[in-house]
Amino acid sequence: LGYACGQEVVINFTPHLVPMYRGILVTAYASLTKDVTYEEVKAAYDACYENEAFVRVLDKDVCPQTKWVEGSNYVDVNFKIDPRTHRIIMMGAIDNLVKGAAGQAVQNMNLMFGFKETEGLLQVPMYP
């Protein structure tokens, strides 16, 4: 991240290990360098991911859940701003057997061979 930003970046990353057969939930924390509003960060998320077929930025106060991405190539993301600690809390959920493995491989193959990025990957998640 620091290389991409051209400056040092410090992020705490916490993968949550729970007794389930598929899915990864992650929380990452970073210090803010200035005061920002929810709307400013949401606009940045939306701009960053607007053309990403498999990234879903969730609505305000909705935390990603692994059951929402189970059996799919989607990653659900969201964030909260903690004004007490001047940190942003970023959350994400993937199905590690699809997005984290086979689905990611198919997505990369599609891009490498000039196929539509979403080819073979638009199955609907298993929930609800």
Task: Describe the predicted segments one by one.
Residues L1-M90:
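C-terminal substrate-binding/catalytic lobe of Rossmann-fold NAD(P)-dependent oxidoreductases
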Residues Y74-P128:
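NAD(P)-dependent Rossmann-like dehydrogenase/reductase catalytic/cofactor-binding core
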